[in-house]
C-alpha cells in the first residue's frame, strides 16, 4: 500500500472484535515505534505492551472520559517516558505513537490514541499518574497516551479528499 493511501485509510477505531493480535504483528508495531525519529536521537520512550484483560480494564478507568476502548482492545501500548530524559519527549513520543498507529493500519489492525497527559480521572487525579500506578512504572514516568489495538469491529470510511480543510493551508502555489 502506498503511504498516501495508508494515511487516507487510517482512522480511529474504538470497537474491536476481541480476536488476539499475533505476536509477530505486535513486534512489527513496536519496531516501527523504535525506529521513530527523536530529538538528538535520545529515544526517551518506553513502550509497555498490555494484553492482560484486568490491566486493560483498569487502564480504561485511568481518566474520566474517552478511555473505554482500552477495555475492549486485544492489546494496548502505553507510550511513556521520563521527561528528565529529553526536552523533546512529548514530540518524540507523539511521533512514535502515530508511526505505530500507521504500522497497525498497514497490518489491517485498528487503533485509537487515548490521551493521558494533562487529563484527569473522575476525582481530579492525573490520568498519567493512574497509568503509572496501574502499570508499576518508575517514579517520574509520564504516560503520554495509550494506544488501544485490535481487529476492528466497526466500519470507518477513508478520509474524503474533497473535504480536506484546505482553508487552513497558506502559501501553496498552484
Regions found by a protein language model. Name each.
Residues 1-174:
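Acidic, surface-exposed loops and disordered segments
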Amino acid at each position: 500500500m502506498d503511504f498516501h493511501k495508508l494515511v487516507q485509510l487510517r482512522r480511529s477505531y474504538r470497537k474491536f472484535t476481541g480476536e488476539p493480535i499475533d505476536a509477530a504483528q505486535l513486534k512489527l508495531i513496536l519496531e516501527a515505534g523504535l525506529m521513530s525519529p527523536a530529538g538528538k536521537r535520545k529515544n526517551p520512550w518506553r513502550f509497555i505492551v498490555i494484553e492482560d484483560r484486568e490491566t486493560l480494564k483498569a487502564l480504561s478507568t485511568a481518566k474520566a472520559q474517552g478511555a473505554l476502548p482500552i477495555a475492549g482492545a486485544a492489546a494496548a501500548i502505553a507510550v511513556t517516558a521520563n521527561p528528565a530524559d529529553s526536552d523533546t519527549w512529548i514530540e518524540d513520543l507523539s511521533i512514535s505513537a502515530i508511526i505505530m498507529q500507521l504500522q497497525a493500519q498497514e497490518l489491517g489492525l485498528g487503533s485509537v490514541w487515548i490521551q493521558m497527559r494533562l487529563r484527569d480521572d473522575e476525582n481530579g487525579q492525573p490520568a498519567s499518574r493512574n497509568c503509572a500506578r496501574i502499570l508499576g512504572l518508575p517514579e517520574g514516568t509520564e504516560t503520554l497516551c495509550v494506544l488501544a489495538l485490535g481487529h476492528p469491529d466497526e466500519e470507518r470510511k477513508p478520509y474524503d479528499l474533497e473535504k480536506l480543510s484546505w482553508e487552513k493551508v497558506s502559501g501553496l502555489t498552484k
